[in-house]
A protein has these predicted regions:
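Short, solvent-exposed loop/turn segments at secondary-structure junctions
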Residues: 13-15, 59-60, 85, 150-151, ...
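Beta-strand scaffold of nucleotide-dependent catalytic cores
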Residues: 168, 180, 188-205
Length: 207
């Protein structure tokens, strides 16, 4: 009987992937083996050498996202679900959380600082000037300025004043950004959900 194969798809990080591979192989015995995923090109014959793939990098590599979706369509179990990446919109996620009475920080979605590719002034004739005084009064300081899409702590700024805010906003290029009330916390947790059934809470230090 063939061993179950668990592949890890990862990028620049070195510590976690190799430690996880070692831990899985130590515990898996004769039934399971873990290894780095190896990809060259993708054929449409739905042939994949893995039973499970743990994804740590596809949010940064579109080619990997497509590979993962093809693997999932072929029966490979993917963690995390690559389809959810297309729903990775922090502002919308906040609204969903509010709808089920989860407390979230006050948040404002902001226009792009610069024109996105293939747009010009006429592309934004529906836009009106932002009343920054209203935004700052609604959120208070300090404010976190962060991209509305994606993660990895990229392009995240903590702003203690309007001057700091505008200096940070000027650096955001054509990203869709959101401004968020800063919450001073006593404890910080990350919640991991597997298969929509198993939930694991972990203490985490975002600093």
């Amino acid at each position: 009987m063939r061993k179950k194969r668990i592949g890890l798809l990862f990028g620049m990080e070195d510590t976690f992937p190799w430690a996880l591979i070692e831990a899985i192989n130590r515990r898996g015995g004769h039934d399971v083996e873990a290894m780095p995923v190896e990809i060259s090109y993708i054929k449409d014959d739905r042939t994949f050498d893995y039973d499970v793939v743990l994804d740590r990098i596809s949010h940064e590599v579109p080619f990997y996202r497509t590979w993962l979706k093809c693997a999932m369509a072929s029966g490979v179990r993917i963690i995390n679900n690559p389809i959810w990446w297309s729903a990775d919109d922090k502002f919308f996620d906040n609204l969903v959380a509010q709808s089920v009475r989860v407390a979230v920080p006050r948040t404002v979605l902001l226009p792009h600082k610069r024109y996105p590719p293939n747009t010009e002034a006429k592309s934004f004739r529906n836009m009106r000037w932002v009343n920054w005084d209203e935004v700052f009064a609604y959120l208070g300081f300090p404010i976190f300025l962060k991209p509305a899409h994606g993660g990895g702590w990229k392009d995240v700024y903590k702003c203690n004043s309007a001057e700091e805010f505008f200096a940070a906003y000027d650096q955001t290029r054509d990203l869709a950004m959101m401004a968020q009330e800063a919450i001073e916390f006593d404890s910080y947790f990350r919640c991991y959900v597997v298969g929509r059934k198993r939930v694991h809470l972990m203490r985490y230090d975002p600093k």
